[in-house]
Amino acid sequence: MKITINQASEFVGKEVTIGAWLANKRSSGKIAFLQLRDGTGFMQGVVVKAEVGDDMFATAKALTQETSLFVTGTINEDTRSPFGYEMAVSGVEVISESHDYPITPKEHGTEFLMDHRHLWLRSNRQHAIMKIRNEIIRASYEFFNKEGFLKIDPPILTGSAPEGTTELFHTKYFDEDAFLSQSGQLYMEAAAMAFGKVFSFGPTFRAEKSKTRRHLIEFWMIEPEMAFYKLEDSLQVQENYVAFLVKAVLDNCRLELDRLGRDVSHLEKMVAPFPRITYTEAIERLHELGFDDIVWGDDFGAPHETAIADSFEKPVFITHYPKAIKPFYMPEDPENDQVVLCADMIAPEGYGEIIGGSERIHDLETLQARMEDFDLDQEAYSWYLDLARYGSVPHSGFGLGLERTVAWISGTEHVRETIPFPRLLNRLYP
């Protein structure tokens, strides 16, 4: 019977066949140990010469790294094994031999591994990170479906930039100009006026010339929008959502976290509510900590975010940023017209901002005035202005960056490892 490695517990004591790749191999005299990988997990196969005969043992000893094969044997429970089960091998059938596999068990440099990203994905570490990424995506759908959100797919090709920035990828759309989307937010606002609570999940593109461990050129975002929600309502959704994601990974990816050496004691503290401080309070706190390179009105850099987050064990919301450094669609605070009703969620342990969100302006005249301040072409945004013309309501939304969230929860230092094929400033291959 053919099974997959993750089904091993159901077949203890039975002879089965597994299609797999040879991740690694070692031998000791008359015993060979095969580390097998099939995409669902890892398992050790034990080949004993006295039990399989000279020819089969010679075949097993000659196997090369990443050779594909069918392995037949009996599944045994083994508490000493890191995978919980192993196979007493009785037969090996080679499907396709692998010659001179470039990623050997020795240490390799980052550039070499990135050049061979299509093969690096096969490693134990990358397998663990991708499993955690998958769990965060799965849990996101579960959370928003349970909360009554409708999944909406905004376009990737757009005729305008949602935040009025210049960090856009330009392309021709027949005889017109088009851009790769930086965010689906404006379209999600339109959907919220139709369906109340909506969310999207898809790729976004930023032509930023940034070379930090937190930045990708192409990354994925979860973007919810909620009609009739004020800022505080949105913050409660955000903290419940992030706490839900962390618990899902703790519940369903414990083996992967262990494989990555993640200290889960930090993650076990991620229970809502999360602390909140204003931008002004954050600036004051930074000055108390000795930062003299930032004044009120400046945006935070990575060292500033890390210093603020270090004061808390959970993610922290920084609210009410200066109006001048935030996008046009954020409304002023009624009590202070120099700041807007917004918040960024800063993850602990130096991982920085993972969520940005705000209330949205729903008054037509206010929105038009803000667009003038930003020198935006109102004709290009006429459809968006229609939302304020025809029965708009107070509404809020946010965007969560998937790769930064995966990096934080998995304890991965650089976001390039949190997406299967990263697009970086100087990397478009493979």
From Swiss-Prot:
Belongs to the class-II aminoacyl-tRNA synthetase family. One of its GO terms (cellular component) is cytoplasm. SUPFAM superfamilies: Class II aaRS and biotin synthetases, Nucleic acid-binding proteins. It comes from Listeria innocua serovar 6a (strain ATCC BAA-680 / CLIP 11262). GO terms for biological process: asparaginyl-tRNA aminoacylation. Pfam families: tRNA-synt_2, tRNA_anti-codon. This is Asparagine--tRNA ligase. It catalyses: tRNA(Asn) + L-asparagine + ATP = L-asparaginyl-tRNA(Asn) + AMP + diphosphate + H(+). It is found in: Cytoplasm. It is an enzyme of class 6 (ligase).
